[in-house]
Amino acid sequence: MELQEVLHMNEGEGDTSYAKNASYNLALAKVKPFLEQCIRELLRANLPNINKCIKVADLGCASGPNTLLTVRDIVQSIDKVGQEEKNELERPTIQIFLNDLFQNDFNSVFKLLPSFYRKLEKENGRKIGSCLISAMPGSFYGRLFPEESMHFLHSCYSVHWLSQVPSGLVIELGIGANKGSIYSSKGCRPPVQKAYLDQFTKDFTTFLRIHSKELFSRGRMLLTCICKVDEFDEPNPLDLLDMAINDLIVEGLLEEEKLDSFNIPFFTPSAEEVKCIVEEEGSCEILYLETFKAHYDAAFSIDDDYPVRSHEQIKAEYVASLIRSVYEPILASHFGEAIMPDLFHRLAKHAAKVLHMGKGCYNNLIISLAKKPEKSDV
């Protein structure tokens, strides 16, 4: 099965769907001030036609309510900054393209658009028709838009996904080189780490090269991804998956060879690795780059009347459901659908232990980029 066929969130609106489990998380809340600053710089740059129509794309938009929460933040930031800057008497039209792979459940987003437009008019005063939302399916490691046609490109929790599993794991090191893990975890061998870093470098360089061409000169990108900081990082969602899969092997429910022959196309770069790639590629300048922590259950609330122990268990089940909604399609394609309930039941147990220890944070990186002006524009 082709990777792009399984690299998507759980579809529909069922109990394990991304639409039901995703919510406005801490990462989105943390990103919003950076988003406003990025929009402010964008409006001041006086790009072509920006006072009439701002063209925006959300790359790797996923599906469900979170997609439109991101869109809402973008629209609110444009309107807020525009009002503060007193750019125009009339608001510009905003054209937003939602991008993800062809298998993404775009229909779950389209169903929400009528109510989203009405809410936007009621709360923001934006008349229906002044914000135009459409889909642009396809891999963001390929061309999506005409050259110099976009003002702002946004991506949250997407660029850590690779275009493919690193080929070096199979070609140079052989099947089973990454024993005991599904990704480039802290404990994996240096050659595995290098294979993943090489693939990320190749993919992120391609991403920057292609999409910088699609931006107007001095256009902006704002990218957020999961990252690593040091060897003391707390377990991230993929570490919890590693633990749960290894439990199934110990219990005899899964063959060890199944794990050793599977690697997920996901890489958590360091801030320095991202910085070096941007500087080496050369089409964009870094305006700011920061890291921050987000908690697994930051978006989850529960009645205080529940016992503390119940709090932890319910939160752990929420964490397991959220992780399941993101990773189940690609995991089920290799390990089989039948084992999924057992896998995520064990993941919930590990999540409960992590939460009980007062841990459960993962590191995030946010980077704001500006396309360097052409020599003729300087």
UniProtKB/Swiss-Prot annotation:
Residues at which Mg(2+) binds: N178, D260, F262, N263
Catalytic activity, as annotated: 7-methylxanthine + S-adenosyl-L-methionine = theobromine + S-adenosyl-L-homocysteine + H(+)
Cofactor stoichiometry and binding remark: Binds 1 Mg(2+) ion per subunit.
Binding site for theobromine: Y157, H160, W161, Y362
Entry-linked Gene3D superfamilies: Methyltransferase, alpha-helical capping domain, Vaccinia Virus protein VP39
EC numbers: 2.1.1.159
pH dependence (record): Optimum pH is 7.5.
The protein's required cofactors: Mg(2+)
Biotechnology: Tobacco plants (Nicotiana tabacum cv. Xanthi) expressing CaXMT1, CaMXMT1 and CaDXMT1 accumulate caffeine and become less appetant and toxic for caterpillars cutworms (Spodoptera litura). Caffeine also stimulates endogenous defense mechanisms against other pathogens (e.g. tobacco mosaic virus and Pseudomonas syringae) by triggering the expression of defense-related genes.
One BP term from GO: alkaloid metabolic process
Any GO MF annotation of the entry: metal ion binding
Tissue: Expressed, at low levels, in stems, young leaves, floral buds and immature fruits (grains), but not in roots, old leaves and mature fruits.
Function: Involved in the biosynthesis of caffeine. Catalyzes the conversion of 7-methylxanthine (7mX) to theobromine and of paraxanthine to caffeine. Has a 5-fold preference for 7mX.
Similarity comment: family membership: Belongs to the methyltransferase superfamily. Type-7 methyltransferase family.
Protein name: Monomethylxanthine methyltransferase 1
